[in-house]
Amino acid sequence: MMKFNVGDFMAELNKQLLATTSGKACEDNIVLSSNVRVTVLTDKMLRVEYNPDGVFTDLPSQTVWYRDFGKVEFSTKTDNDILVVETKSVIFNINNHTGSFKSAVIDGEEKTYNSSHNLKGTTRTLDGTYGPKELDEGIVSTDGVSVYDDSKTLLLNDDGTLSLREKGTKDIYVFAYGNDYINWIKDFYKITGKPPLVPRYVLGNWWSRYRAYTQKEYEDLMSEFFRRDIPLTIATVDMDWHWVDIKSKFGKQTKKEQHWNSGWTGYSWNTELFPDYKGFLTKLHDMGLKVTLNLHPADGVRSFENMYPQMAEALGIDKETEKAVEFDLTNNKYINAYFDILHHPYENEGVDFWWIDWQQGTKSKKAGLDPLWLLNHYHYLDTDREERRPLILSRYAGIGSHRYPLGFSGDTAINWSVLDFQPYFTANAANCGYTWWSHDIGGHMMGEHDDELYIRWLQMAVFLPILRLHSTSMDFLGKEPWNFSWEAEVLGTEFMRLRHKLIPYIYSMNYRTYNDGRALCEPMYYNYPEKEVAFEYKNEYMFGSELLVCPVTTKLDAKTKTAATKVWLPEGRWTNIFDGKIYKGNQEAFINSPINTIPVLAKEGAIIPMSADSGNTWECPEHLSINVYRGNNTIDFYEDDGETGKYKNGEFSISKMSVCEEGDTIKFTISGGKQLKCIPQKRIYTLEFKDVEEFDEVSVSINGIETPASYGKSFVNIEDVSVEDEITVTLTGAVAKANKPVEERVLDCLTHLNGSNMKKAFTNSRLKNCKTENDYKALVRRVKAKSFRMCLDEAIFALK
């Protein structure tokens, strides 16, 4: 094993790799009692430390970076072995000698924590899974209280390095929020740091595939996507961008290497596949694509690499010995050289961010230090520059990993069970603050070719944080829509276009995550914690503030040609964005989806800003199409340049979009935003009132001045408008869209049903004789085919 001088480890880290933290708490909030120190962080959250020597630390940890949020009013008393800490909201009971949490009293009710009631969080990876996987604990619990044990994490020193804790110590965080899960996670973000604002371009469609493309093949493939008008924003090149067949290519040169047969690690472009890699990166950028490359850094830097001489010199190795530069994230000299020599030059040439594909376990030279965590930490900090918003793609490395988006969930099987697990898996990660999972859409490996599965996976992905197509290297496993049936190609193309159009909405929700601590995909019980039923529908979630999503994860029924998905609809009116069906709230119901739709329901008053620009541009659109649903609601429409850190200095625009319904009058307003270089000087707005049949009159005013506009039965088009302008559109005599009469809905079910026409005729005659709801219920109960029964149930009872 290669040895380094002590000076290697004592070298200072690049300043870019030093996190900004504030671990010392407000002195007024600290209580010392024997070998226990309690810090009142908020009126609902404590830090409790135990040290047999009575020595405590203010250093931040790998997870917790901040502890000073101002003075909190509280009182303390000792009751036998219990230290009682009382704030305005909670009475905490802590063991005075061990620091163990005993209970908390919230609104007069004593609550204890049972880890089996934890709502779970997420897990490191789904690699190799064929279906569900056990999840790690999250931060929130149905007990109303929870304990996060930070004792096993390392401490983060001022110089950016990590140190071990003293043995026998305890460091826990106690949360007591009842069923207020939203503020539970918000306050968790106070101590860990909030989720960053991810770049705008990550919200479009990604192309990725594990395949040894040539430069021309990859360029031609991107051109083919655009020829077919399928927008992409990110081009991923898996590990074959560098030399992989090391033995045959460098056998003689690497004969002294211990790892000569491993091609996963590499930093030198494969010039046989990419003869002009700089031109390749430039061409992808010219196509409007951002580029990410795959990394497997575990084998360090070996003698065949182009950068080996520089790395060897930086680490004090005689290059003539051809000794590998060992991968070692406990060595500051290595860390600095790793970024300065291996990565920064490629970034300057056009690599926009890195996909860190670490799969080599959790051990390193420092006890308790997971290399994945440190790779995520340093890589993310290294890319945080004013002109370049930080970004990585990597696996989850434990609580606090939300600071380092995006998450890569790993290589799963191609099957329905994996698909069925992913909606729950994605939304449930909100319980540990992890908001940006990215999956291999369509599955990665194994399984079988299934057009229907591909369609359903892609449909779900439109309403996930990231849509990244990916697959393994088999020649026939490409996820291009045209590799599937005609129906799958048409629908896959249509849904990828929809995802691209949704970037303005998703980006505004990205800001909501950053500013308000609300996950893009959020379990239903966050908004409805008092409803027990909200906990039962694990595959159902809110996609931003406006849309309820429950993906289809089962096959079509042969008779009905639909897939039945059971959903829970909260109070209010819910409208399917695909077919316009309107559902009653406060019910559990089956939604029967043909192959071209899934249950995505707009809430009452929903506002969905979308891009109507052509092509694959991801920037702020010139033509903004806004889908509006009747009701009363306001959203913040957020815009900035999408890729730099200038928003931190105020270079962003927020426009309030509001809808107000009063009788047959609907008023929609857009407050003036801020004009920025990244926003078109003049913009076209198309307002589509999705659940309005028609209206008598429309008036449009800009900055209070009546303005002419074009319009149709349910849309209004306004041109030549500045982002700073205040817009008011008023519809009078608006007629609300309604579902078809129940008789027509029932006939639709029969018309599309595969089966005996004589049996259908018999059923139809009986349905025609139904006069009351009870008549329908009695008849539906007698229908033998479950799938048809569910279709009738939706048509008769679920719709308004």
Regions found by a protein language model. Give the residues of each.
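Solvent-exposed beta-strand/loop surfaces of large extracellular or lumenal domains
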Residues: 59-73, 260, 317, 575-595, ...
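Accessory, solvent-exposed terminal regions and/or long lumenal/extracellular loops of proteins
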Residues: 605-705, 723, 731-800
